[in-house]
Amino acid sequence: MQPGLKAVWHDFRGNLCADIEAAPVKGEYVVESVSIPEEVKGNIGLVLTGYLEVPADGIYTFALLSDDGSTLMLDGELLGDNDGAHSPVEIIVQKALKAGLHPIEVRYFDCNGGVLQMELVNEKSEKEVLPSTWLKHE
């Protein structure tokens, strides 16, 4: 496993995350966080894939912020649906996870604005940076 997530940038002009991969690929990157690579500008359709490696069994809470749409798949399950054209909107999602690797996919598109961020929410409901060491790819 390598550090970070794979990020594929598509030249996307749509309004639904499910349609991103039909658009032409403009670039491929590795990112250390759920975010937009600096080089990515203009029409953005982004698909981030890899694994989330959690250190211990537990119930994990995540905050996903995006402008415009985003979706979060974890272990093949649609965990967060923040799809559609909108100003910045944050959703909070929870999932019980066993220690170890879990497949993750984040889809994101931007019509105008450009915000994508995923954070960990601790037991005190405080947001923390998702540790970059938790993100891996093959």
Regions found by a protein language model. Name each.
Residues M1-T61, L65-E138:
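Extracellular/secretory pathway-exposed regions associated with glycan biology
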